[in-house]
Amino acid sequence: MLDHFTNAQLIAFAIGLAIAVVIAVVGYLIYRRGRTRGLRARFGAEYDRAVLTHGSSREAEVKLADRETRVKGLGLRDLAATERERFVVEWQAVQARFVDHPKTAVSEADVLISMLLVALGYPKGSFEQRAADISVSYPRLMEDYRRANAIAVRPGRADASTEELRKAMIQYRTIFDQLVQHQKP
């Protein structure tokens, strides 16, 4: 069957095929690099955390893309003005309790953040699922959210120092301020 082609034609075909393969591989590598840069820029430290958790950048990128797809389907919504005001009043009460009952206030702040997330359309679920979901819209808050939650739910929370509790409240305040101002993307 190849008898109809000259050696020069076969060599030209082989070279053309090799060039096409090289172009395809280079194109794929450029695509992957761009995707990695984009996800790293979008998710920040959460990207690095996903790589550590999943063992490879490829697996982490798949999981982060899955998060984005999941969150797009959640039906997130803005708070009504009355809801926003109710959450602000509740937050102020939690903050006021911190002076006399810091451990209780930190636990209440954690619960209030969870309630606020549900009001915004995020589903109830485990902390890790909530964290994964909100990392799509608020990746820069994740480190604060994880640290504050670790103190709020720590067994033996009584061992948390006043300074740790104060930092947790500040972290929750940062999260609260961002979430209560949420505007649907």
What are these regions (language model features)?
Residues 3-38:
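N-terminal signal-anchor transmembrane alpha helix of single-pass membrane proteins
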Residues 27-30, 46, 144, 171:
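Intrinsically disordered, low-complexity N-terminal regions enriched in serine/proline/glycine
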